[in-house]
């Protein structure tokens, strides 16, 4: 009997930012090997990144990014995992799953390996409930349903744009919390998936994240972080705040909870504190900005919504620091680059090295 075809095998790309050899993929081989990988190499482009044999992938370094985007490459962060969003831009698939290279396969309470990708796909293919909270959490999961009192008119739910997974072992803490709790580990496995209610923000983590690129892709910009920027480690959260405002406006849902991955190592809290220092103060003004942000009804596409947000960022956050003027401009550049790359089809292939061209042609064209 033939093995079942993996879910969304030809409709999903796995995006991995990295500065090191990808030995961690061996652990993920049973789950990832059927899918196409987009590897975004950060740091020194002359360094050779080794990928285990048997994986279908394309790899982009900074030289590739500069060739493909030209002057617009300025919107892609350098020396920061925010560079992963370049992979979102060049993907031609409907769905994206992104994972960090220090994330391993976790086990459920029974000791079984968790297929994180499969759970993300299930989350994305089922509706969300952003407009009315179901106290049994996700009513579309096996063994659950809508509770008494849930409006029948809302039971069709909303399309799910984002599936936000969690982590066992090393928690995703900010630097001050890391310093206070250096030995804390997350050992609690909560068997739940829930929709984040409309009007509620959340701190999105990019290390175990999936989304519907067609529904929300242009909003998944991880900002200007890392080299030459006054802030770091806020890339995924910035994208999450923008995405949540846009999802609320467009009637889309975001789920959080399962699946878990095993986060294997803690980053240096002193290095993190230096990166986060400005953000720790700035977020006390950034978050109220997003809580109050509204988009006009004329904004009916993600791009229109994002460009409107960029105007509001420049107008209302630039008083905090000139960085936000630069960020607002980069948001516009990101959308321009996204539209050019996704509307021009294959014309940007000539910018790539012959090896990458061949990989792309054999896969897509």
From Swiss-Prot:
Task: Kindly list the cofactors needed.
Answer: Mn(2+); Mg(2+)
Keywords, comma-separated and alphabetical = Cell junction, Cell wall, Cell wall biogenesis/degradation, Cellulose biosynthesis, Glycoprotein, Golgi apparatus, Isomerase, Secreted
* InterPro entries noted in UniProt: Nucleotide-diphossugar_trans, RGP, RGP_fam
One GO term under biological process is:
protein glycosylation
A GO MF label: UDP-arabinopyranose mutase activity
The catalytic activity, as recorded, is:
UDP-beta-L-arabinofuranose = UDP-beta-L-arabinopyranose
Per the UniProt entry, the Enzyme Commission number(s) are 5.4.99.30
Motif DXD motif, chain ranges: 100-102
Compartments annotated for it: namely: Secreted, Cell wall; Cell junction, Plasmodesma; Golgi apparatus
| Required for activity, annotated site positions | 148, 155
Q: Which GO terms describe its cellular component?
A: cytosol; extracellular region; Golgi apparatus; plasmodesma
| Keyword Glycoprotein (UniProt) | yes
Tissue expression from the record: Expressed in all tissues tested, including root, tuber, leaf, petiole, shoot, stolon and stem.
PANTHER family annotated for this entry? UDP-ARABINOPYRANOSE MUTASE 1-RELATED, UDP-ARABINOSE MUTASE
Give the function comment from the record: Probable UDP-L-arabinose mutase involved in the biosynthesis of cell wall non-cellulosic polysaccharides. Was initially shown to possess an autoglycosylating activity which is dependent on the presence of UDP-glucose and manganese.
Complex formation: Homopentamer or homohexamer.
Q: Which family does it belong to?
A: Belongs to the RGP family.
Q: What is this protein called?
A: Probable UDP-arabinopyranose mutase 1
What is the source species? Solanum tuberosum
